[in-house]
Amino acid sequence: MLWFQGAIPAAIASAKRSGAVFVVFVAGDDEQSIQMAASWEDEKVTQASSNNFVAIKIDTKSEACLQFSQIYPVVCVPSSFFIGDSGIPLEVIAGSVSADELVTRIHKVQQMHSSKGEASVTNDNQSESSVSTPSASFEPDVCENPESKNTELCETPATSDIKSDTATGGECTGHDSHSQEPHGCSNQRPAEDLTVRVERLTKKLEERREEKRKEEAQREIKKEIERRKTGKEMLDYKRKQEEELTKRMLEERSREKAEDRAARERIKQQIALDRAERAARFAKTKEAEAAKAAALLTKQAGTEVKRESTARDRSTIARIQFRLPDGSSFTNQFPSDAPLEEARQFAAQTVGNTYGNFSLATMFPRREFTREDYKRRLLDLELAPSASVVLLPAGRPATSIVHSSSGDIWTLLGTVLYPFLAIWRLISNFLFSNPPPAQTSARATSTEPSNSASSSKSEKREPVRKRMLEKRGEDFKKEGKIYRLRTQDDGEDENNTWNGNSTQQM
């Protein structure tokens, strides 16, 4: 099918010039439109519509279809309109048909178009023959065709415009007939038809466009009003939602605060109960501890009483062990108030003249008693309740080696009994050398002479300590707080000198 490439007004003008049938094919995107388009593209249809047909194809979504539908209502899609010279639709095909059916319809339209053309020629001849004798019955015939053409070509919903145009055309025709010029009017009719129709179509299209613009403006205004109304409603709805949300949040917060307060109250009550329970438990514990402490104090008091009684009993007696130079020893008990002279006399009576003139001394602490000490009490000399005293023969130092008595018998006995004597000395030193704790209190409550004696003993020990430190200085080398043994190289290191960069100078 050869489709006209141009707008609808140009296609109408081309059809008018050639006296052809104006074909308008309104197609869409559906399946029927595709089938109908295929029928139009068929070779049979192309051959049948090659002469006396000006065809144009428009889309339903285009502006041309909108303009065309304002004159010829488009009922369904697809649609095919066959419009004659007068603007009257000769045939309208609604929907999709086959190619053969379409060829049949085209032939039918050709017959209708040719018959209408002959009728129009006959009417023109009759009008020319009757120009000399005009009558009243001719007037409606002369103006019938323009009126019908105008009505058929411009058939739209706006019927008031068509009626006004028809009335105007009628008046013009009547005026011409009364002025005895029917022949001139009939000659100008073909030229006027096309111009008037095009002008009317253009004017009506402009009016329709203006109405459409106004309608669009009104529609936009309504849309804007609706949009504003909808926006206001949405804002109101959102505000209500926000208010409800805020209200719910406040209620939730109030409920949470109430729950927090209740939880805090429960915690406070639990803390108070725990404190009361701990206080009661602590009081019970304190009472139990106080009872235990009282029982312990009572027990300790009883123990102290026993100790004091034992100490008093023991403090009244001084047990003295006399150790002889040959390693033997003997023991005797004396009153604690007895002087040391009594103990010396007992030792002299026991040993006789074996060791001659001797003196008494203690080894731990090391002390040799003088003549003045013999007059003092055993308690004052810290020899009560027990002590170990060594007999020192005259002329021998306290640290001298003890020799056995003359005679092979004593040597043999000393050799045999020496292990037993050593064991006995260890046991006796362990048992009798250190006084019990009760003696410390007795010593603390001793008189002033005992303090003076201890001070004199400490004064005697000072020279010995100094000599030991001097001797230690010879054997050890002090480096800060560390002592190390001296070697042969230490003397050489002390004689050497060192410079600032740790290099030895000889």
From Swiss-Prot:
Phosphothreonine PTM positions: T487
- The source's domain of life comes to Eukaryota
Keyword Phosphoprotein assigned: yes
Q: Indicate, by first and last residue, each region the UniProt record lists as having compositional bias (Polar residues).
A: 120-136, 153-167, 496-506
Listed A to Z, the keywords are: Endoplasmic reticulum, Membrane, Nucleus, Phosphoprotein, Unfolded protein response
Q: Where in the sequence does UniProt note compositional bias of the Basic and acidic residues kind? A: 457-489
Q: Where is the composition biased (Low complexity)?
A: 444-456
Residues on the membrane's Cytoplasmic side span: 1-411, 433-506
* PANTHER family given in the database record: UBX DOMAIN-CONTAINING PROTEIN 4
Q: What is said about its interaction partners and assembly?
A: Directly interacts with VCP. Interacts with UBQLN1. Forms a complex with VCP and UBQLN1.
The name on file for this protein is UBX domain-containing protein 4
The species is: Mus musculus
Q: Which gene encodes it?
A: Ubxn4
